[in-house]
UniProtKB/Swiss-Prot annotation:
Essential for recycling GMP and indirectly, cGMP. Residues 4-184 form the Guanylate kinase-like domain. Its main location: cytoplasm. One of its GO terms (molecular function) is ATP binding. Disulfide bonds: none annotated. Belongs to the guanylate kinase family. Pfam families: Guanylate_kin. This is Guanylate kinase.
Length: 207
């Protein structure tokens, strides 16, 4: 069976990354494409399901996983830990399913070091003006908060060249098509096609 591909997807806040991934998943069968499920020590929110939204663990369990290098990446956010389990990712990839991981540039660097065969995609907004509009459209944040978000977005965007693919999300449908095209091209790589069609190739080359 052909091994699935791990896709690392990063973008500044407001670039439409989460919306693109969710739209992609709706067009792909579950046996082809899934989104990574992280471990976290925070408490479940109403409606969240263990194993579907997150793997909920306590602090001792999380630290034990850190001690045995069980995470591809992990970080602490507002007193809670979040991490991507190597075992959970590898189990899904072994079934031939592609996995999408929504993560920032720092986490992406950690993962590329441990899984160099992962493919990475960076999503940019079409302009700073449009990014500012999207950030303001989310809620009634103060100018100070918006300025901070914009500064964080610029810092995130400065790492775009570390990625394999670049998508500019100007028109959503076009950006979604670009994302699908990347997946299609990766699935046609020789290494995956050779595994997928091994029996056929053997028959074609037989005397």
């Amino acid at each position: 069976m052909a091994q699935g591909t791990l896709y690392i997807v990063s973008a500044p806040s407001g670039a439409g990354k989460s919306s693109l991934i969710q739209a992609l998943l709706k067009t792909q069968p579950l046996y082809d494409t899934q989104v990574s499920v992280s471990h976290t020590t925070r408490q479940p929110r109403p409606g969240e399901v263990h194993g579907e939204h997150y793997f909920f663990v306590n602090h001792d369990e999380f630290k034990e996983m850190i001690s045995r290098d069980a995470f591809l990446e992990h970080a602490e956010v507002f007193g809670n830990y979040y991490g991507t389990s190597r075992e959970a990712i590898e189990q899904v990839l072994a079934t031939g399913v592609d996995v999408f991981l929504d993560i920032d540039w720092q986490g992406a660097q950690q993962i590329r070091q441990k899984m160099p065969h992962a493919r990475s995609i960076f999503i940019l907004p079409p302009s700073k003006i449009e990014l500012d509009r999207r950030l303001r459209g989310r809620d009634q944040d103060s100018e100070e908060v918006i300025a901070k978000r914009m500064a964080q977005a610029v810092a995130e965007m400065s790492h775009y060249a570390e990625y394999d693919y670049l998508i500019v999300n100007d028109d959503f449908d076009t950006a979604l098509t670009d994302l699908k095209t990347i997946i299609r091209a990766e699935r046609l790589r020789m290494s995956r096609q050779k595994q997928r069609h091994d029996a056929l190739i053997s028959k074609l080359l037989a005397d």
